[in-house]
Amino acid sequence: MFYKIKNIYFKIIIFLIFVFKLTFSSSYAKDNSLLLMITEKTCLICMVWEKQIGEIYPKTEIANKFPLSRIEMKDFVNYSKHELKKTNVTPTFIFIRNNNEQGRIEGYTSPEMFWWQVDEI
């Protein structure tokens, strides 16, 4: 009987380690990857993107790899988390992984074009 109790505790510990590792791994990936959207409150194209893509983006597979983070253009000028080249276009989407720019999309024309550009990155 003591052996069975010991075996159950062992299985529970292994299970908890597995769950912890799985949780830690996925949050680690999210912390090191993001999609930075540079926007402005008065940007009409940004508003169109929000309506057409912004509402569904969090539900997509790419959002698991690159969670969306928005920043105003005026704040991007002083943004120093990552060394990124400047932009004068809103919206601009910068894909960042491990503090390095993986790709960027400047502007927005349509959902089809946006997803095509995302696939290219």
Could you describe each region identified by the protein language model?
Residues D31-K41:
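Short active-site neighborhood of thiol/selenol oxidoreductases, capturing the structured segment around
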Residues M47-I62:
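Typically the conserved alpha-helix immediately C-terminal to a functionally engaged Cys/Sec
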Residues I38, I62-N78:
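Thiol-based oxidoreductase modules, predominantly thioredoxin-like and allied folds used
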Residues S110-I121:
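Thiol-/selenol-based redox modules, centered on thioredoxin-like
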Residues K11-T23:
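Bacterial N-terminal signal peptides
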Residues T90-G103:
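A short, hydrophobic beta-strand/beta-hairpin element that forms part of a small beta-sheet core
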Residues T39-I45, V89:
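Short pre-active-site segment immediately N-terminal to redox-active cysteine/selenocysteine motifs
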